[in-house]
Amino acid sequence: MKYFKGEHLSYDCVVKDGRMLYMEIFKGHVLRDGMFDFWETVTHEVGSAQINNIVNWTAANLSGYTGCSCYETISDNMIEAHLRMGDIDRFMNRTLMQSIVKLYRDGSWEYQEKEYRKYYLFAVFAPYTQEVNINKKLLDQAEKDCVFFQLDSSDGELANPPAGKRIFALGTWDRDVGVRIRNKLINNINPPIPDEYVLPLYGYKSD
């Protein structure tokens, strides 16, 4: 098995009979050992050659398929392909979700993006053996301040990497807001998450 190094991208797509209707591209900022610091949308920053590779692969391999698809690449090498949505549901865009439902239901697509905005999806990981307690008021405030907020199961049964389980994920249109909320939650977790999981995080500052 080859080991790839380089830029990790996730392509969140909607297709009809293999024809690309919609594409959003996320860039993953790696933490270590399969864990990620955060993802950000880079759709308008990726070169046309890379995008065309995905479009052409989809047309060649999904010619009879209509619906969501998701691909992951490292340095232009495709490492995963799924017939499902990736992370675009975390935009909390009702119009987009309704358009996808309509595509599945009757094959029509009407969605038009009014304005492109950068989106950031932050995560926090901890050791599998760690119990995590977070003040409910802080969780409620985070849910209010974020576009998307998800507190993950404490048993770590999600598809987590070997080195740690994800504690929560939050999404915002403003990177600084995401950093601030994440730092606030991290610094109020009891017992504290080990430094090796939090010190390398983008923008992390202890209280």
Where are the language model's segments positioned?
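Active-site flanking residues adjacent to catalytic metal/cofactor-binding acidic residues
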Residues: M1, Y71, I79
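ATP-dependent carboxylate/phosphate-activation module, predominantly the ATP-grasp catalytic core
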Residues: D12-A59, A81-R117
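Short, charge-rich binding segments
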Residues: K2-Y3, V14
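A structural supersecondary motif
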Residues: S69, R84-D87, V147-S154
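Domain-scale recognition of functional cores that engage charged ligands
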Residues: K5-H8
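Hydrophobic side chains in beta-strands
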Residues: C13, S75, V124-A126
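A short glycine-rich, hydrophobically flanked beta-strand micro-motif that places a catalytic Asp/Glu
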Residues: L62-D76, L170
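Peripheral (often C-terminal) accessory segments that flank ATP-dependent C-N-forming ligase machineries
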Residues: K102-D207
